[in-house]
Amino acid sequence: MTVEELIVYGKGKTSSDHAKMLLSSYLDVNPLELLTILDKEVDSDIEKLYKSSLEALKENKPIQYVIGNVNFYGLKFIVNKNVLIPRFETEELVEQVVEYTKDLNKDKIKILDLGCGSGAIGLTLKSILKDSEVTLVDISKEALEVAKLNANNLNLDVTFIESDWFSNVKLEKYDIIVSNPPYIRTDEEIEEIVKNNEPSLALYGGVDGLDCYRKILANIKPYLNNKFLMAFEIGESQKEEIYDIVNKYLKDIEITCKKDLYGRNRMIFVRNKID
């Protein structure tokens, strides 16, 4: 079958966008490039893979898991059922952290990524901040295996620790500690495709969604350098509660909440107060 015939076939199984996304991924081209190769005959093995993937989509599997990777900040990350699918909004968190490093005036920045999942945040920071020392932490051995594959594919030299937050992390000082922890309430309604496919360990943060923030902030102080930044992704309604938790454990700080591109409170930044 030709590219055009497969696109038409795919539209009968899923959305036009998903059909093109799948096919372009397997042909290793940009979706827009499909229009330039509509008459191209597609290898039979790719055709079979494409058709089987369309069936997986009909079973309400996330397209990122079906393809097996996702683009994040211009980098390709392997994803599977053991890791949360990196969201576009998290790229904004990375951008803000990179911007902050300009104020540090320091060559070798030490960064800790807590609950790293696929490694999207920590590995992206390492790819941008070449001289930084990055440590990625996750409680899930399976998630760390995915993160290690991504580090290898991206040729990034980082450290991995299997740990329940700080429990196995050696006491060292970090300039930046970043985390996108589970923050969904246990009784919160979420999309079926998310609930049925992405790891619950990476989604749910207890009755009020704040358990992980409490655990992190209760133990974070000894790991902070004299000049530091903490960066968290949060649920859009959690700003005030997290401010309270931060202020319970840390003094002489500045807290900033930033909105994402959709105008939602989604990022909190904590740094030492500058006189």
Question: Where do the PLM segments sit?
Answer:
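Non-catalytic accessory regions of SAM-dependent methyltransferases
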Residues: M1-L35, K40
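Residue-level signal for inorganic ion chemistry
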Residues: L22, N60, T90, I121, ...
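Conserved AdoMet
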Residues: S25-Y100
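Conserved SAM/SAH cofactor-binding pocket of Class I
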Residues: E92-E191
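Mobile active-site "lid"/loop adjacent to the S-adenosyl-L-methionine
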Residues: P181-C212
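Conserved Class I SAM-dependent methyltransferase catalytic core
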Residues: D208-R271
